[in-house]
Each structure stands twice: as C-alpha cells, then as structure tokens.
Amino acid sequence: GVGRNFFNQIAKPETVRKILLKAYARKEAVTDELIDLLMLPARDAGAVEVFLAFTGYSQGPLPEDLLERLPCPAIILWGDQDPWEPIALGQAFANFPSVKQFIPLAGVGHCPQDEAPELVNPILQNWILEFAAPVGAHSGS
C-alpha cells in the first residue's frame, strides 16, 4: 500500500542522509558509518510495520505525562541548534521535579548523542556514577 511505498522511498541511504543533514548542526557527524548503522533495521523483516506504527503513533504518552510520574531522577541534554524541537521546550521540561539537571549543548542539533558524543558521554557517565546505587544495594541482605 501507500505506507509501504512511502517506507521504500525514505529507507534509502541518500534520503536518510538528507534528513540527518537537516537535523544535525554538526554536518560532519553525518558519516557513511552512521548512515549504514541507521539503515540496518530497515532491512529486518517487519521493518515496514514498525515504521508505520511509529509514524502513525500520535496518541500519548507525551514527555510531560511521563516526567510527571518518573520515579527516578532525570537529566535532559538539549542541542541548542535543534531545528525541530526548540530549546524552550526542553527548558520547560526542566521544571518537572524529576528533572535534576538541564544541560543545553552549544552548537548541537537534534541528536546530541551522535553529533557530539565527546560532550554527551562524559555527562552521562558522571550522571550514572552520581545516581547509580552501590553494587549490592538491592541484594536484600
């Protein structure tokens, strides 16, 4: 059907590259390796169905619904050059009690983890070390 044809049109390396070049502030992060990694799931059986379910999913839950109930501390990293989600949205999410830190990332777009792993990874490593339970804390002894 129409959905399968649409999937087949966008599940091409050149199309994925064009989309990423719009989303990423750091254009040099859009590498052939990244495109190949992102294309792998498109080759799986059932990929069309998953894609159609994802693109047709317009009902909740919204981040604000989840942040309200989140039972653990949260951190938000947000690229200040994100063309699709304005930084003001991330700043609004930072007002939820579960959000302990909001960190804007200068010069980064929609996918900070891919665009700027040298910024994101140390922040997340420190966050995990700060909030992770000590080994054995949940052993029941």
Model regions: which residues?
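Conserved loop-alpha-helix segment in the C-terminal half of the alpha/beta-hydrolase fold
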Residues: 69-108
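Conserved alpha/beta-hydrolase catalytic His-Asp/Glu region
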Residues: 5-69
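Generic structural signal for small/hydrophobic residues in well-ordered secondary structure
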Residues: 19, 38, 51, 76-79, ...
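Glycosyltransferase donor-binding loop in the core domain
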Residues: 8, 43, 82, 109-112
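Active-site helix-initiating loop/hinge in glycosyltransferases
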Residues: 62, 86-89, 115-116
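Catalytic active-site module of serine/aspartate enzymes centered on a nucleophile-bearing elbow/loop
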Residues: 98-141
